[in-house]
Regions:
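Catalytic active-site module of serine/aspartate enzymes centered on a nucleophile-bearing elbow/loop
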Residues: 118, 122-149
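Extracellular/periplasmic catalytic domains that process cell-envelope and extracellular macromolecules
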Residues: 11-12, 20-21, 59-62
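The feature captures the conserved acid-bearing segment of alpha/beta-hydrolase catalytic domains
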Residues: 42-111
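Conserved acidic catalytic loop of the alpha/beta-hydrolase fold
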Residues: 2-17
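Stable alpha-helical elements in mature extracytoplasmic
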Residues: 3-6, 95, 132, 136
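Active-site signature of alpha/beta-hydrolase-fold catalytic machinery across serine-
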Residues: 31-35
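Gly/Ala-rich beta-loop-alpha elbow adjacent to hydrolase catalytic centers
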Residues: 20-29
Length: 149
């Protein structure tokens, strides 16, 4: 509810927002996308850990451009989190199939598939965070959501 109130206050000052969320922050984003689909211009999901259930109303996901960024995050140092990360990864194919089914405008960046390995769950704090930020910026430019780098 506080997140929605914040968005409502923002609407008085700006024409739209690009939301960037990390991990469990994805949990709150669906409600914002559903409630304010014309105000949310795009969503960047970084290592999203809680994606909506496939049987929920996902109509906003068909309207709002989305970028999903995932690293490999498979360190043996984090066994509990490692098991959670594996659970998230197992759900990704079904989520992507659902996005395809509703004709969502989304881009999936799997960093290991792009040859970028060794990231933690905290991509924004890793040594190559400038490279990842560059990928995100390039996507925003490609979508016409920002003018320059």
């Amino acid at each position: 509810d506080a997140y929605c109130k914040y968005i409502e206050r923002l609407q008085k000052h700006v024409d739209g927002v690009i939301i960037m969320v990390h991990s469990q922050g994805a949990l709150y984003t669906k409600e914002i996308m559903q409630k304010y689909p014309d105000f949310v211009k795009a969503v960047v999901f970084i290592e999203a850990a809680s994606l909506p259930a496939l049987d929920e109303d996902l109509s906003a996901f068909a309207k709002i451009p989305q970028l999903y960024v995932y690293g490999d995050f498979m360190s043996d140092d984090y066994k509990v989190v490692h098991s959670w990360a594996e659970s998230v990864r197992r759900g990704i194919p079904a989520w992507r199939a659902k996005l395809d089914e509703i004709h969502a405008d989304y881009t999936w960046m799997d960093l290991p598939e792009m040859g970028i390995k060794g990231n933690s769950h905290m991509l924004m704090m890793d040594n190559n965070n400038d490279q990842i930020a560059g990928f995100i910026n390039d996507w925003l430019v490609e979508k016409g959501l920002c003018d320059n780098k």
